[in-house]
């Protein structure tokens, strides 16, 4: 499958089997997981990306009426999507999720040797001219306070801790529901975990406190 588990097997199954929220041609839509596949290269390495569920949170609601198209895709090594499509649809394991879980849990190894790749692309009119902006980065595991941490552990914790720091400093609403998009990249960069977000910002953005 060109894949190994670094987190929840059930979480991966949900991402690959549940409908995905999106905005298509200006309208809220539900698109199918594993569809919308595209290929791209980052630092000379090839990747594929395809629809998966759950990544946008409330962003479709926030950007309704402001963007024409919005989607969220998971990045994998080439060939992974086709193998999963065979399992889910060729063998119809999407209809038997417990069996799918047993197959994946027994056949796909768990590993702490991982890498997180983030790529964000936006296009639109600026000054009457169509422009596209792309930001991308990759993060690998690293030691933290005497223990080796995986890339998914570091990036997941960084998002949570960055948001907590912004909340504690009064930079986020102090009551009510707080959306993930209210934590701007520029604000997150100025937190103690800001180095994990630095590559996603323009080079001219002011540096923040990136200490551990």
Give residue ranges: language-model regions.
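C-terminal catalytic/substrate-binding lobe primarily of soluble NAD(P)-dependent oxidoreductases
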Residues: 1-212
């Amino acid at each position: 499958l060109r894949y190994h588990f670094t987190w929840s097997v059930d979480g991966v199954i949900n991402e690959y089997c549940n409908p995905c929220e999106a905005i298509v041609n200006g309208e809220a839509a539900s698109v199918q997981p594993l569809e919308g596949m595209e290929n791209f290269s980052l630092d000379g390495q090839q990747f594929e990306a395809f629809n998966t569920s759950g990544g946008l949170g409330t962003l479709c609601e926030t950007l309704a009426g402001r963007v024409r198209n919005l989607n969220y895709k998971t990045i994998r090594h080439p060939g992974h999507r086709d193998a999963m499509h065979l399992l889910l649809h060729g063998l119809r394991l999407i209809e038997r999720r417990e069996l799918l879980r047993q197959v994946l849990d027994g056949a796909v190894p768990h590993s702490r040797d991982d890498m997180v790749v983030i790529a964000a692309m936006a296009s639109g009119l600026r000054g009457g001219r169509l422009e596209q902006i792309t930001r991308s980065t990759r993060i690998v595991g690293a030691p933290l306070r005497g223990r080796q941490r995986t890339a998914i552990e570091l990036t997941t914790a960084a998002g949570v801790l960055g948001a907590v720091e912004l909340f504690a400093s009064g930079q986020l609403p102090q009551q009510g529901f707080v959306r993930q998009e209210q934590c701007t990249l520029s604000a997150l960069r100025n937190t103690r975990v800001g180095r994990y977000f630095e590559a996603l910002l323009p080079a001219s953005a002011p540096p923040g406190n990136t200490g551990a």
